[in-house]
Amino acid sequence: MAANWLLLDGSSLMFRAFFGIPVGTFKAPDGQPVNAVRGFLDMLARLVSDRKPKALVVATDEDWRPAFRVKVIASYKTARLERGAMPAELQPQEPIIWAILNAIGVEVMGAAGFEAEDVIASLLPKITGTVEIVTGDRD
């Protein structure tokens, strides 16, 4: 049975799309890499086609290392501090992905100071029916 709701951790899927398709494989007419855009949209199309949800929400990280979490676990995502939060080639692709989702009517939600999984967790008590959560995160 298909889930009524499909909740996606958009930020983690965006990173997977970026690292899953080499930079330079797909470029916009101006030469800007769009590998993450292509990969994300391909994943989304496959998920919707396979799962056939009645509702879809894409949650985003508005803070990839929230202060409240670092206060509890000082080492939270410290490896990212050393290598940088987001690769330079991915940064301009993020707003393109969210804009495309908005343009096609997909709800994109984020909350200042929180990660996508926090947004997803806050939605669960408000949802009736079955839910499937899709994320690439392992934490």
Residue ranges and their predicted role:
Residues 2-134:
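Noncatalytic, basic helical substrate-engagement surface that gates or grips nucleic-acid strands
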